[in-house]
């Protein structure tokens, strides 16, 4: 249960400001570590600023979702949600300048498959990468190298509570206890879209899975012109507890605002920041504390297979 979970105790935070402080601390700690090794000065332009790290994390998190969406065999939604949560948690306390998000995102997906018991072998997993067999083998070596690091940085808190199960639970509840809504399934598509958009934000680090699921359903109802206030007051028994109802409405409003204000990173900005990031991970600077095999760092192309049509129509290196 979520309320007794490590997710509630250790990975649900009070505010966006708290998340910003954690990320800024991770950025500062890495800079201090890099300066201490004598290769750079404190204000060296090679360093990424916290807001630049956030931009890169947004980009690679979207890449992670895209990788999972075309994965063969089809990856369950809970596995995708777990992988994304691992990625978010990892970069609360670590810098992209130390651990490259390209390999971390793959390690998150790989570990999520194991934890959520999605039966896929290591060769099957790397078979989804757009790489030669040798390249896939080397990438797997990297993933296995980083797997224990990832587990340690997650403080061994590997069970993730996603909003997808409570979402299905609310739909069942609407069907059985809320006759005013004749066909709750009409809410599913728009609610699913909301869940996809909220996954790109920090909502999973700020709100409970049931709050996210309920907000998705009520947002869908609102867009369809359906009023469901009576569901909150009658079916969820909040009529007599106006304080709890008011708090819930405030939470849902802030979550919708979080989704509304999310801005995907601009391609030109990402391109410039990726160049800056690669310099941090270059062999001559070697700012990253643990030097890894270089394969997998130089090129984004290996992250997902192309279709045969794409292989014919687009040159290597044009993926996303």
Swiss-Prot record:
GO terms for cellular component: nucleus; transcription factor TFIIH holo complex; transcription factor TFIIK complex. It is found in: Nucleus. Gene3D superfamilies: Cyclin-like. Pfam families: Cyclin_C_2 (PF16899), Cyclin_N (PF00134). SMART domains: CYCLIN. One of its GO terms (molecular function) is cyclin-dependent protein serine/threonine kinase regulator activity. The keyword Protein transport does not apply. Keywords: Cell cycle, Cyclin, Nucleus, Phosphoprotein, Transcription, Transcription regulation. Signal peptide: none annotated. GO terms for biological process: regulation of transcription by RNA polymerase II; transcription initiation at RNA polymerase II promoter. Its main location: nucleus. InterPro entries: Cyclin-like_dom (IPR013763), Cyclin-like_sf (IPR036915), Cyclin/Ssn8 (IPR043198), Cyclin_C_2 (IPR031658), Cyclin_N (IPR006671), CyclinH/Ccl1 (IPR027081). The modification Phosphoserine is found at residues 5, 132, 304. Regulates CDK7, the catalytic subunit of the CDK-activating kinase (CAK) enzymatic complex. CAK activates the cyclin-associated kinases CDK1, CDK2, CDK4 and CDK6 by threonine phosphorylation. CAK complexed to the core-TFIIH basal transcription factor activates RNA polymerase II by serine phosphorylation of the repetitive C-terminal domain (CTD) of its large subunit (POLR2A), allowing its escape from the promoter and elongation of the transcripts. Involved in cell cycle control and in RNA transcription by RNA polymerase II. Its expression and activity are constant throughout the cell cycle. NCBIfam families: ccl1. Associates primarily with CDK7 and MAT1 to form the CAK complex. CAK can further associate with the core-TFIIH to form the TFIIH basal transcription factor. PANTHER family: CYCLIN. Belongs to the cyclin family. Cyclin C subfamily. This is Cyclin-H. It comes from Bos taurus (Bovine). The gene is CCNH.
């Amino acid at each position: 249960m979520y309320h007794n979970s490590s997710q509630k105790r250790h990975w649900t935070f009070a505010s966006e400001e708290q998340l910003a402080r954690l990320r800024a601390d991770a950025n500062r700690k890495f800079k201090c570590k890099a300066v201490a090794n004598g290769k750079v000065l404190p204000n060296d332009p090679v360093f990424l600023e916290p807001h630049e790290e956030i931009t890169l994390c947004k980009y690679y998190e979207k890449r992670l979702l895209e990788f999972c969406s075309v994965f063969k065999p089809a990856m369950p939604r809970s596995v995708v949600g777990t992988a994304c949560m691992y990625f978010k948690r990892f970069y609360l306390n670590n810098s992209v300048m130390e651990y490259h998000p390209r390999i971390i995102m793959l390690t998150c997906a790989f570990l999520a498959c194991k934890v959520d018991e999605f039966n896929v072998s290591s060769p099957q997993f790397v078979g989804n990468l757009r790489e030669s067999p040798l390249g896939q083998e080397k990438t797997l070596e990297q993933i296995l190298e980083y797997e224990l690091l990832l587990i340690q940085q997650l403080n061994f808190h590997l069970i993730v509570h996603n909003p997808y199960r409570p979402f299905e639970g609310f739909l069942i509840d609407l069907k059985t206890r809320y006759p005013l809504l004749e066909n709750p399934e009409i809410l599913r598509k728009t609610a699913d879209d909301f869940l996809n958009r909220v996954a790109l934000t920090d909502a999973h680090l700020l709100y409970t899975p049931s709050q996210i699921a309920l907000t998705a359903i009520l947002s869908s109802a609102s867009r369809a012109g359906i009023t469901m206030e009576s569901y909150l007051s009658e079916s969820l028994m909040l009529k007599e507890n106006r304080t709890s109802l008011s708090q819930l409405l405030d939470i849902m409003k802030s979550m919708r605002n979080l989704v509304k204000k999310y801005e995907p990173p601009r391609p030109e900005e990402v391109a410039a920041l990726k160049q800056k990031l690669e310099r941090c991970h270059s062999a001559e600077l070697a700012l990253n504390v643990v030097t890894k095999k270089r394969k997998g760092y130089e090129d984004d192309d290996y992250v997902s297979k192309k279709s045969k049509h794409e292989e014919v129509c687009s040159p290597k290196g044009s993926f996303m």
